Structures are given as structure tokens and as C-alpha cells.
């Protein structure tokens, strides 16, 4: 689903609204997003349709992120920086996806099949980085993918809850991913 600029802003506002007010009515969600109930009703019809639209848009955005970062060809460190930046550009949708997470959300045999191309692209990227000697080889590419997702999604959730400042998130994520929590002065 390709959204025009106005719809993109609306969907981001609705993603935040539904996370901040999970039991809100469509009218309350419309108010939180800064539109009328009639506009929201025309946009999605029902709350279930809204959730489906947000999930569909999340899938589209994640695939666009993968494409924009050129993970197959770019130098791994440069691609990692772009990957972090692109994810943070869409932090509202990431927060929504975290909010929607269920234990079977990523099950490749169920509804999670829709996320497999995203996960496979990240796995392939980290494997390529390992093969080029950029990322360590004692951790599997799949685990790197899980760690990356956990760090990025955790950071955007921490920002939402006021526990992290968004201004430094990209640098913090890059440093944690590449160097861990050890004190650089002790190296």
C-alpha cells in the first residue's frame, strides 16, 4: 500500500494513538490523531480495519527500508548506519508493531510469513558482513538479526516511554550493536 503524504502522517498519528490509548474508541483515536470521526471512518471504517491497515503499512515500510539500505551491495558498516536511520525514521510504526507483538507474530508457518522476507534480508546482510570480516563469526547471522530487531524496537519503545532521548538514538544503537556495553576506555 502506497500512501500519499497526508495519509502517511495520519497513519503515523494513528499508530501512536492506538498504542497510547489501546482501548480508545474510533472517535477518541480520531481526536488523538487530529482528525474528525467521519474522516477516520472514511479512512478505515472500523477499528479492526485500522489495525490491519497499520500492520499492512508496517510490512510495506519494513520492505522499503530493506530496499533503501541496499543491504546486498553497500559496505556493511555504512549499510548498518542506514538501516538504523531508516528504522528510526519510522519509529511510530515500529512502536505499533511492538505493541501488536504476540508470541506467534513471527511464526513462518502462520501469519508471521508476511515478515519472513524482512527477516531473511537482515539474516543475509549480517551473514555478508560476517563473510567480509566486519561482524564477528561466533554469533550466527540469525542471532544478529534478533539482536538488531530487539535493540531498535526496544529503543523506540524507550523513547515513547520517556526513558531515552530520540536525538541520540542512532548513535547509541550503532555503538551498542558494534561494541556492546563494555567501557571503551578499558579496551
Curated annotation (Swiss-Prot):
The gene is nfxB. This is HTH-type transcriptional regulator NfxB. Gene3D superfamilies: Tetracycline Repressor, domain 2. Residues 26-45 bind DNA. GO terms for biological process: negative regulation of DNA-templated transcription; regulation of DNA-templated transcription. GO terms for molecular function: DNA-binding transcription factor activity; DNA-binding transcription repressor activity; transcription cis-regulatory region binding. Keywords: DNA-binding, Repressor, Transcription, Transcription regulation. InterPro entries: Homeodomain-like_sf, HTH-type_TetR-like_transc_reg, Tet_transcr_reg_TetR-rel_C_sf. Confers resistance to guinolones. May negatively regulate the expression of genes that are associated with cell permeability to drugs. One of its GO terms (cellular component) is protein-DNA complex.
